């Protein structure tokens, strides 16, 4: 009798779990779908909801806020006088902050990433906006076509920025794959479930850093920096370097014939104000807080000391590459060429 009772309880629990799984909606409809829970994505969702729209916000990671919620805050939005309106309300309202001189301006040093994420989450929850986490773009349905690969466009530096003629078909829906991040907080190579959720909407806003919805939509787009003349903007195009250090870039110091060190770009930067085809090197970084509660750091299976040679030379030459606490406790990189397929664990753009 006891065994029968135990079996019945287990069976009921299993059926309840299966029913809850089956009850999860696989199709959502909204007036506005915002893809990318970055800071701009959250603000776009809030603005649309304020206008009376039914909004769905999709964020492939576990939390909202993008770089503001998980980046190096003082670099992402360090100058307090640049934050205002609704954004200020979320990020700064009710805080006692202090300012210090940073990069020639006043940097706001307030709360950390976790608190910012909580503020973004609360702002969305207070407005009743549906948020879907841990699902990333798989396909885009445009008109009668289903697109699963980005369309290629010409960068500004290589061609004119010309939109296609005529009325292009609109996005009907996007299809999401279930792809939770791994234990280190990074995206997994292959999703656990493809075609998990479909979201239909009248308007789609791509607020992700990657721009995958845009790339699969068939809309015209470009990348890189426009020239100063393109839109008559005095600060556009190639700008002067902020930091210059005389570090030998060659595998064999002083010998150009030996080639350049890993991840050093052997290319000339154009004249000031000119266009280029470079993009920001968005990446995932590891943060060390010194608490001893983090996960162990295993030795990489493909570790190559040469990838860190530029650091060794910089340190030997007296370059202070860890001049502030953010640099001391994280691994990060800056700029990457569009053709790069792999980035180093951490890299300063030298030369």
Predicted features by range, described:
Residues 6-16:
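Bacterial N-terminal signal peptides
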Residues 20-22:
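Boundary at the C-terminal end of the N-terminal hydrophobic targeting segment
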Residues 35-38, 58-61, 67, 71, ...:
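Active-site-proximal beta-strand/loop segments in catalytic clefts of secreted hydrolases
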Residues 41:
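N-terminal Rossmann-fold NAD(P) dinucleotide-binding loop
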Residues 47, 53-54, 58-170, 201, ...:
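Conserved N-terminal/central alpha/beta ligand/cofactor-binding core
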Residues 152, 157-203, 207-351:
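Flavin (FAD/FMN)-binding glycine-rich loop and adjacent Rossmann-like elements that form
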């Amino acid at each position: 009798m006891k065994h029968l009772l135990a079996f019945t309880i287990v069976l009921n629990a299993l059926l309840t779990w299966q029913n809850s799984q089956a009850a999860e909606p696989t199709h959502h409809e909204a007036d506005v779908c915002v893809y990318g829970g970055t800071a701009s994505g959250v603000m776009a969702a809030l603005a649309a909801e304020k206008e009376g729209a039914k909004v769905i916000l999709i964020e492939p990671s576990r939390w909202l806020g993008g770089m503001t919620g998980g980046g190096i805050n003082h670099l992402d939005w360090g100058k307090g006088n640049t934050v205002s309106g609704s954004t200020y309300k979320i990020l700064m309202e009710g805080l006692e902050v202090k300012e210090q001189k940073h990069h020639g301006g006043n940097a706001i040093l307030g709360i950390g990433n976790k608190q910012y994420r909580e503020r973004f989450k609360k702002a969305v929850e207070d407005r009743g906006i549906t948020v879907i986490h841990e699902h990333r773009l798989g396909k885009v349905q445009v008109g009668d076509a289903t697109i699963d690969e980005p369309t290629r466009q010409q960068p500004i530096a290589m061609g004119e920025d010309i939109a296609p003629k005529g009325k292009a078909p609109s996005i009907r829906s996007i299809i999401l794959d279930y792809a939770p991040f791994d234990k280190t907080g990074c995206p997994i190579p292959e999703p656990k479930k493809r075609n998990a959720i479909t979201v239909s909407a009248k308007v789609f806003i791509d607020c992700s850093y990657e721009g995958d919805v845009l790339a699969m939509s068939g809309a015209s787009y470009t990348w890189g920096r426009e020239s100063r003349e393109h839109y008559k903007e005095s600060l556009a195009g190639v700008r002067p370097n902020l930091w210059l250090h005389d570090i030998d870039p060659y595998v064999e110091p002083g010998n150009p014939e030996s080639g350049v060190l890993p991840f050093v770009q052997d290319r000339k930067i154009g004249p000031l104000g000119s266009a280029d085809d470079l993009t920001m090197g968005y990446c995932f970084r590891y943060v060390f807080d010194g608490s001893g509660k983090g996960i162990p750091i295993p030795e990489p299976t493909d570790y190559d000391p040469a990838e860190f040679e530029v650091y060794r030379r910089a340190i030997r030459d007296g370059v202070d590459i860890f001049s502030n606490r953010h640099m001391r406790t994280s691994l990060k990189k800056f700029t990457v060429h569009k053709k790069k397929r792999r980035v180093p664990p951490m890299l300063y753009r030298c030369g």
